[in-house]
Structure formats: structure tokens, C-alpha cells
């Protein structure tokens, strides 16, 4: 069991980490053991934008994340800019934020990070920095 001092320090450390991209990256790394950069520009959906058919289950995680952010934007949120707080424990990821948009953004990121973890076996380095021109097929609905 960790000492109370270590737990307090870890809570403070998590509380100091704010900024959506930073948080999402930390979530990804904690859930997968991979650098968040390994998911940037992966397949047809991971990174900025997305179109055509996802290349694998990892890419489907990014498609779902894009859809989640799209729903938040329709509610008037700015998920790419929302800053929120979260913590990670053996029991999962816990989201917090002052506003509904912050909490919902955290939930989108949480679902994506957990999806990446569930689908670690589908991650294929050949889809890293995948050229968009190689993406084919219809664009699936959200």
C-alpha cells in the first residue's frame, strides 16, 4: 500500500496537469503504455480530420472519438480547447471539470483511451503516418 504522502503527491500532480491535448495524451499513455504520438496521424481518423473507412479497430476508436467531439461541438462545446481534470487508478479513469463541457470532453477522451487499450492487438505500425490518399471506402456515419 502506498503511503498517504505519495497518494497526496500523486493527486496534486494530476490536478496540476490541465489542457485537453496534454490530458488526452496522458490518458493514452497510462492506458496503453504507448506514447500518444504513436496514435497521432494513425490510419484514416487518428489526428486531425478523418474520412473513408477506418483501417482497423484502433482507427475505429479514433472515428468514435471524432464523432464524440462532433456531438459536443453541436452542444456549443469546444472539446479541442476544453481543460479538465482527471485521475487514473486501478479502478479506471475518473473525470472532473468545472463545466459540463469540460466533463463531457474528458468522457470522450476517456472512452477513446479505453478503446485503444481494448484494441492494442490491432495497432499496426504500417498505419502510423498513414497517407490520407490510401484511405478508401465510404465514410461511416457516427
UniProtKB/Swiss-Prot annotation:
Swiss-Prot/TrEMBL GO biological process terms: arachidonate secretion; inflammatory response; lipid catabolic process; low-density lipoprotein particle remodeling; phosphatidylcholine metabolic process; phosphatidylglycerol metabolic process; phospholipid metabolic process
pH-activity note? Optimum pH is 7-9.
Main localization of the protein described in the UniProt heading: secreted
Q: Which Pfam families match?
A: Phospholip_A2_1 (PF00068)
Residues bound to Ca(2+) 1: 45, 47, 49, 66
Q: Which cofactor does it need?
A: Ca(2+)
> What outcome follows a substitution of residue 66 to A?
Loss of catalytic activity
Gene Ontology annotations for the cellular component aspect, listed alphabetically? cytoplasm; extracellular region
Q: What tissue specificity is annotated for this entry? A: Restricted to the brain, heart, lung, and placenta.
Q: What does this protein do?
A: Secretory calcium-dependent phospholipase A2 that primarily targets extracellular phospholipids. Hydrolyzes the ester bond of the fatty acyl group attached at sn-2 position of phospholipids (phospholipase A2 activity), releasing various unsaturated fatty acids including oleoate, linoleoate, arachidonate, docosahexaenoate and lysophosphatidylethanolamines in preference to lysophosphatidylcholines.
* UniProt record similarity statement: Belongs to the phospholipase A2 family.
Name the UniProt record assigns to this protein = Group IIE secretory phospholipase A2
Natural source organism: Homo sapiens
Amino acid at each position: 500500500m502506498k503511503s498517504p504522502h505519495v497518494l497526496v503527491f500523486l493527486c496534486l500532480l494530476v490536478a496540476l496537469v490541465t489542457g485537453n491535448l496534454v490530458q488526452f495524451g496522458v490518458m493514452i499513455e497510462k492506458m496503453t503504455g504507448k506514447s500518444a504520438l504513436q496514435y497521432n496521424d494513425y490510419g484514416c481518423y487518428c489526428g486531425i480530420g478523418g474520412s473513408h473507412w477506418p483501417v482497423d479497430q484502433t482507427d475505429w476508436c479514433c472515428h468514435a472519438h471524432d464523432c464524440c467531439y462532433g456531438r459536443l461541438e453541436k452542444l456549443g462545446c469546444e472539446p479541442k480547447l476544453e481543460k479538465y481534470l482527471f485521475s487514473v487508478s486501478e479502478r479506471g479513469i475518473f473525470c472532473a471539470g468545472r463545466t459540463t463541457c469540460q466533463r463531457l470532453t474528458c468522457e470522450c477522451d476517456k472512452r477513446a483511451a479505453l478503446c485503444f487499450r481494448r484494441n492494442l492487438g490491432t495497432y499496426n505500425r504500417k498505419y502510423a503516418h498513414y497517407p490520407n490518399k490510401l484511405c478508401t471506402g465510404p465514410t461511416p456515419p457516427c
